[in-house]
Amino acid sequence: MVPTILLSALLLHFTDVVAAEPRYILWVSSVVQRFSSEKACLHLLNLNESVSLSVTLEYDGSSTTIFDQPVDEGNFYACADFKVSQMSSEQLAFVALLVQGNTLKISERRSVAIAAEENATFVQTDTPVHKPGDTVHFRVVTLNIWLKPVDDLYPLITVQDPQSNVIFQWINVTTFRNITQLSFQLTPEPILGDYTIVIKTQSGTTVMDHFTVNRDVLPKFEVELTAPETITIADSQFQMVTCAKYTYGQPVQGKAQIKVCRELFSPAHCESNENEICEQFTVQLKDGCASHIINTKVFQLDRSGLFMTLNVNEVVTESGTGVQMSKTHSVFITSVLGTVSFENMDPFYRRGITYFGTLKFSGPNNTPLVDKLLQLELDGKPVGNYTTDENGEARFSINTSEIFGAQISLKAVYVRPRSCHRSSWLSPEYLDAYFSASRFYSQTSSFTKIILEPKQLPCDQEKMFSVLYSLNPEAYKEASDVTFFYLVMVRGGISRSGQKQVRVQAWNGNFSFPISINADLAPSADLFVYTLHPSGEIVADNVRLQIEKCFKNKVSINFSRDKDLPGSNTSVHLQAAPDSFCALRAVDKSALLLNHGQEMTPESVYFTLPYIHQYGYFYNGLNLDDQQAEPCIPQKDLFYNGLYYTPTGNIWDGDLSNLLSNMGLKIFTNLHYRKPEVCSSQENQPLLRTFDHPNERIMMYGGGAPPSSAFHDSVDSISHAKVAIKETVRTNFPRTWIWNLVSVDSSGTANVSFLVPDTITQWEASAFCVNGNAGFGISPKVSLQISQPFFVEVTSPFSVVRSEQSDMVVTVFNYLTTCVEISVQLEASENYEASINTQRNTDSEVLQAGEQKTYVWTIIPKTLGKVNVTVVATSKQSRACPNDASKEQDVHWKDTVVKTMLVEAEGIEKEATQSFLICPKGTKASKQTLLELPSNVVEGSVRSFVTIVGDILGVAMQNLESLLQMPYGCGEQNIAQLASDVYILDYLKATDQLTEELKSKAQRLLSNGYQNHLSFKNYDGSYDVFCQSNQEGSTWLSALSFKTVEKMKEYIFIEETVPKQTLIWLVKKQKSNGCFRRDEKHVDTAQEGREGDQEDIALTAYVVGVFLEVGLNASFPALRNGLYCLEEAFSNGVTNGYTQAILAYVFALAGKEQQAKSLLSILDKSATKTNNMIYWERDEKPETDNSPSFIPSALSGETEKTCYVLLAVLSQDTQDLDYASKIVQWLAQRMNSHGGFSAMQDTTVCLLALTQYMKLTGSNPQNTITLSSEESEEVFYVNRNKRLLVQHSKVSKGHQQYTVDVEGDGCSFIQATLRYNVPLPKEASGFSLSVKTGKSNSSDEFQTKFELTVTLTYTGARESSVTVLVDVKMLSGFTPVVSSTEELKFNSQVTKTDIKNGHVLFYLENVPKEATSLTFSIEQTNHVANIQPAPVTVYSYEKGEYAFDSYNINSISDSQ
């Protein structure tokens, strides 16, 4: 066998001392940053003559000079700064080195990359969680890689809802002093979930940030559960600590109920069929906290067959109010009692330099195991025993002088005592540690090693770095001075350089040198230390320094006081670099408890920053590794001392080229720095270098309150008058308090005053600042605790029914430093009776410091409507209390809380209206009004008023958000409202009546409505009645949506793709004959023409009418083919009155006058003409409608049909306005009190018709209107300037007769409205309905939760009712359990659930003739006695079908 010898050792033996020939080294970063200062360092050694030196950076036809100077003979070292100052699209560049003398010429040219200008854009929202209807504020700031602000232009900023619909858009947004600040308003009914803010930057990158929209109520207090993350099977017990604190820092008084369970794998094997082992206990909170020791014996931790987790569920209940907050926690169980690991290990060992490392022994939760014996093995042989210190660590060192192997293998084990365990149970384990270190190559066997403590280095201090060295003395002179050099690289570029001269006595030693640590190096830097061996080798080492994430712009904010009072004045002191521009933000801590979101922190800023760590010489597709490899060593035997040796390389050895590649540092040199490579055969291909990594570079992206002491700790800083009583009224409760941009003056400070909100909470405040020179900085968070030493809280139900008795819970908090005498009074009122249920000896009592007391009053309301209940709590010094209050603290306080309670009448509400459009034409015109009440009206529930306005559309203009008296939970109601608003806006704009105030209001409504309506859009562009059903969309609804969204583009932002996508879907619904296919569902059978064979014709007419209304070109294929379908139907004969009306309108729009006139002539013959009015009735007139006023009337079809005729008359080339006015007279009588009509369909069509009519006729009234009865007389004036003014007159007896006299010219609209309650009707039409209540847990002694089951059956003429609403009113003092209502969405018929103003709404589709049951839970939150029944209503949207029932909890059954 031929012996082998390590190649490096053989080469060293055969290497003679190299002659002193000229040497050179040029250091330059492989990626050069544009517009930033870069550095290059150059060594010239052993020059035997003077030379000229030139180093240039060549790029895109230009060049930048780095060095250009003469150099004398000898040695030369210098570093030069340079900058790429020109814009260039080219990324590839070259650095050229030229050293020219008489006899010497050194020339080398290598590639580098010029980094594309990359910036980081950050988004900050005012709060991470918003509620419906909020105004959302956000900021945008862009920084370059050096944290300098960039005055960027953002081509596009959009906001996307959870379904990726763009709901807001800003184009070409500029910054103000490098910060952009925008806002938008959410609709009151938004899609709940995560919203996305999308920023398109000038460079083409996209930045996104998120916030959440939900209906969560801000938590009253927070619960912290402290328990170990992990326990071992050997632990007999562990401690669990529960703490509950109000957001303003004070402890909660109450109790904690804790349940700890361990689940079984197979519960079926248990006799009791239980699937878990549980322990439950209750602990009382003391000072807001409670500690409990959990005994683990019951959980059998070392038993197999159970999950290795303890599930902890905790509920904290506040005393007095019963408010609960829950918390969950998981405790993991492990059989691993300890883990040995290696820490701070170098991947390479250097022979001759001691190898250092750390052993760590830790238990679960990373707890250090102290005073334990660990054994270290090297290549399988023990080298020493080590005992762990108080940190569970033990330092070790290994002498490497006699180690020659390519790798060393280390193993560390815990020297454990012997033990025995049963095989069927879990056994304790200890995990060993393993590590391998490779040899580092040096041709001269010379090494350096930087010693670095493995911790983050703090900013703004000087750090001493120690370097070990072991140098081969060959080629050195005796007692030589050796010069060590260092480079510091930050974000891919050379930032600093220096040198240290060391007097070498022994060739193994160490030295130290300082480096100033500051923000320029953050968040990490590479330190590279090297020396030049006379034998022609570079001896070097590098380490990566982790730097504190600090900023050059030092920003700090402070409140004038750490704690303050609600409603007080405070100031914020801001410090930053002079002339900085700063963004302040203060958020209620309660909002952060819901979701911390992507908070802007130093960590998130640096994490997002595109700083460079180059691994390998690849950048953006460029291979910058153009260093020519040295010739490989042929695999040829060498003869030495009588033996043949075969060269063997080692692919695992580290060398300097690895270190340089890791840093992205390029070298131009003729010195030795690579390990030799053996020429390989095909079967012995060398592997890639261990540390070369072909990634372009690493780019990091991301998003990203101390418990306070008792209030009295700082109450001394709040000055109180010693005699005056402090009285507070609290009304301002925002989630975000401070959202301001502030300039810092030339001294670097700013003071800003703010009014503290009334929320008793803790505010979390911070600021970030930008400055052209100092760059970006962000402050640490500061807190301001807001509390009153003495205040009262009141809890009561939102609404009650008259004659019910409700409990009002009043809690008084005393956070003064002493006990006080308190008095709590509920003020008397003629609107209610009040009696106290809490026993007390006198009107005043003593309340100890830090405690609270609860009182309960029973309230019996006497009047209907909103009733204000006033509670007053006062405090004063008591003789029974020691006088230990702070001298500066006043104990005289008065806190007043006014609680509003809605008192409702029994039964359900009905409405009757009587309307007239009176046009006197210079004479006097009179009308009589008489609205009669039914005999069963609820006493005291009658409300009546008369409305006078000079424009028939005036009432609708005042009710743009509520034209109909019904819930807006379906897509049909939502788009009908939007369409009506657009018609009115178009009318106001056309008649020059659109004021900025009205336009602003309408735009807000349209924007909110558009957001809502996107929730009904399917992914194919169609719209459905219910949110995102993604079933077959409704053609009628999609057509109306397309038209409305197209017309809304004139007033608000609409994403272009939204209507286009709907148009594409509509076109696909067209058949080959040009007609549009009827909908399989959501068909409104209440209207004529939407039944039978002519349904396709009516639907086609509607869609074609939409195409014409939005102005599609007549050549548009779907429009042209649709008209062909309608003409064919017309020629075949149309007998249905509704279809005739809509066809007449469409033909008039299309300019087909002959067909329009023919249809109008036919319709005129079937019209009802009476009292100067014209209208059309249904062919089959239904019985008189007795349904409640909020249920769509079956007679709405007559109104819609009449309005289509009016549209047809007005759309002809020659309009008959006299004929049209008679139709309008009848329509005026059909208007409801909100300006709409009976239902959604007739409202949209009729408002379009009325706006078209008013555009043609105008509105210029000059009227005097007298409203008189036997008892009173009132006069109103209407003129051109007041034509849109809606005037009201409350009348004492709305059901008596009134006379309306109108004098003057022009028209005025007069409407009398009567509202009243009647007992729940017993009749039904189309449905049967029953409601049952049951106990949710029959074992509860004090029942607070109940199950409510609503069962409905369709009994109408059709197979099923298409769109149905179930409205369940909550009993007084009760609220629905939201999770139980949400679960009903899994019912195939329930498409949506909603909770509004004490009502639970269920939207259903296709309710069959079989019984459908809905079961959900309700919970009593406030005690109410003599509870009145609550009504439940079911009705159909398309047809006047309905049923009623009621429920109560007086008679209940246990739920099974």
From Swiss-Prot:
Name of this chain's protein: Alpha-2-macroglobulin-like protein 1
Secretion signal span: 1-19
Q: Which UniProt keywords apply?
A: Bait region, Disulfide bond, Glycoprotein, Protease inhibitor, Secreted, Serine protease inhibitor, Signal
Query: According to its UniProt entry, what is the function of this protein?
Result: Inhibits protease gelatinolytic complex activity against type 1 collagen.
A GO cellular component annotated for this chain's UniProt record is:
extracellular space
Species of the source: Mus musculus
Keyword Calcium assigned: no
The record's listing under PANTHER family reads: MACROGLOBULIN / COMPLEMENT, OVOSTATIN HOMOLOG 1
Q: How does it assemble?
A: Homotetramer; consists of two dimer pairs that are disulfide-linked. Part of a complex composed of complement component C3, CLCA1/CLCA3, A2ML1/OH and ALB/serum albumin.
InterPro entries per the record?
Answer: A-macroglobulin_rcpt-bd, A-macroglobulin_rcpt-bd_sf, A2M/Complement_sys, A2M_N_BRD, A2M_TED, Alpha-macroglob_thiol-ester_cl, Alpha-macroglobulin_TED, Ig-like_fold
* Subcellular compartments: Secreted
Pfam families (UniProt xref): A2M (PF00207), A2M_BRD (PF07703), A2M_recep (PF07677), MG2 (PF01835), MG3 (PF17791), MG4 (PF17789), TED_complement (PF07678)
List glycan-bearing residues: 48, 172, 868
Q: Which family does it belong to?
A: Belongs to the protease inhibitor I39 (alpha-2-macroglobulin) family.
CDD domains listed in its UniProt record: A2M_2
Under the heading PROSITE patterns, the entry gives: ALPHA_2_MACROGLOBULIN
